[in-house]
């Protein structure tokens, strides 16, 4: 089975004062999308250094704390009540860290504080993402994982050369010119870039562009993984999924009996199951007891994840899991302000590390993530696996009510994606 997940976040920067027509010499140095940056380590090097591991692991606990803080804000937002939640915590952190590399003073401090990086130096964060992107970017037969950035710059707008160099070097960023004064054409060009990077999974993210936008920072992540042990499509059947006490939907329910890591956290009213992809990535499924989702959402944090990891044990499990394909889009402006990042959106924003030409501020931060889960796949469909099962009654895990998912990358200790499947058919 190939699980396909795509993510993209957009940070749009608007001028905070009157924007005059550009004059000669005020451009961003001819940076275009014609060249594709490869990290100097070499993406084909399969052996990350201790330095790379340490740099990634330095960010991991801060990124996990940010992930759960952001999840709780999203889950409690009236705008997403009853809806699916899905986002890439590490992608959002990466986009905001790129933004922070062009911020100064209180604006920079607020972004770093909101991300949990107050005790870290900018260089540590930049190098952490450089190594993280490198380590995530190893494409293997059973897995494809790509992460990087794009910087779309208004034609004639002058951007600090150091910012562009850092964006390319640390954040695997490509830079290209866009005529934002023609919003429809600009949106089409940016959407084309995003579609290419997400394997056409996210195709129409940017629309209704403000013609006064000067710059757009884009972060993308694309993941395609094959289950370590695929589901047999002949066992997939129709079943009910209880969205809430008043709503039941019918889903295609996959079934598999196999050895899985499982833990029943009685104290926290949760069953936790780890379903591995091939290589170093896995899906952690968190299934709260009936009526306990809100309680679990309010309390869950990175310490739960570590505790569950430590207590998981291999057991025979009858797993029933719905096939689904969901897409979630959210504006993060309000949530990020609640997390203390206020100046970036205000006229007092200081992005002098990004441009000295005019005062700019962030106009909006938008993210979109797409998750598809099924039992099919080119290799998986042809694969045959045999497991030796113990002669004992298996545990039964039926995902027929809302559950949480976390896509974890073990070598970097990263939460690549997380969310709540509230309605697999929505």
Predicted regions: what they are:
Residues 86-104, 212-227, 414:
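Hydrophobic/aromatic-rich, well-ordered segments within soluble, folded domains that form packed cores
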Residues 86, 94-97, 283-286, 406, ...:
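Structural recognition of the beta-strand scaffold that forms the well-ordered cores
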Residues 111-115, 231-238, 296-307:
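Short Gly/aromatic-enriched secondary-structure transition segments
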Residues 367-369, 375-426:
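C-terminal soluble interaction/assembly domains
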